[in-house]
Amino acid sequence: MTDSPADLRSAFRSGRVTPTAGLAPGFAQTNLIAVPQDWAYDVLLFTQRNPKPCPVLDVGDVGSRETVLAPGADITTDLPLYRVWKDGELADETADVSGLWRDDLVAFHIGCSFTFEHPVAAAGVPLRHVEQGSNVPMFVTNRECRPAGRMSGPMVVSMRPVPEHQVSLAAAISARMPAVHGGPVHIGDPTELGIADVAAPDFGDPVNFEPGDVPVFWACGVTPQAAVMASRLPFAITHAPGYMLITDIPDSEYVLEVPDAR
């Protein structure tokens, strides 16, 4: 029996630490970035100007640890792993940030590509990182995001090896889910994104290719963390890459209906 989102959040609250790819199939997952209220407009504008890597699914009230995406959840304890940033530098990685939370923080929940993995897998497309029990590999690219106020930085992408004959299928399925990054931003040669070695990700784990696999790159919600570093935010709390908030929202809620052509 598959654990429910609530069961998994409870396990994370109790100390279980694991990447969330492949967990609670059928339910949306989100990236988290929480910043001081003084920076919240900059972040909001940055996400609005860069919707491909930063599709916002919810913004919390100032100081709130709650989200409508997971009623009853505490976003300071119910993700498996967090990162704490000070002056743009990684200060800590911890499974509980409840003691670091501040009354002036505003939390942004950003769509995650793990959400479209369930329908992609259901269509018969293999997910190599799930098969291999690893985190998805993520890379900082040479594509700069559109700056907003004090926020700027490069786009981050996730990479999945896909059998060449199934690339168009994976692209079409994900393209119907723009709230969780939509279709790929690049297919094939990683050097066009400034990625020298797909076996050496900036975040996550390396993944092994099978014969006939092609690297496919999707915009990634770790992009705000790259902006935190580039913009040297004085303080921020984020998820650790690959360790997401598992919500109660079915992934089907984020699938665009295709108009009837008749």
From Swiss-Prot:
One of its GO terms (molecular function) is lyase activity. Its EC number is 4.2.1.-. Pfam families: D-Glu_cyclase. The keyword Lyase applies. It is an enzyme of class 4 (lyase). InterPro entries: D-Glu_cyclase (IPR009906), Putative_hydro-lyase (IPR038021), UPF0317 (IPR016938). Keywords: Lyase. Belongs to the D-glutamate cyclase family. This is Putative hydro-lyase RHA1_ro03475.
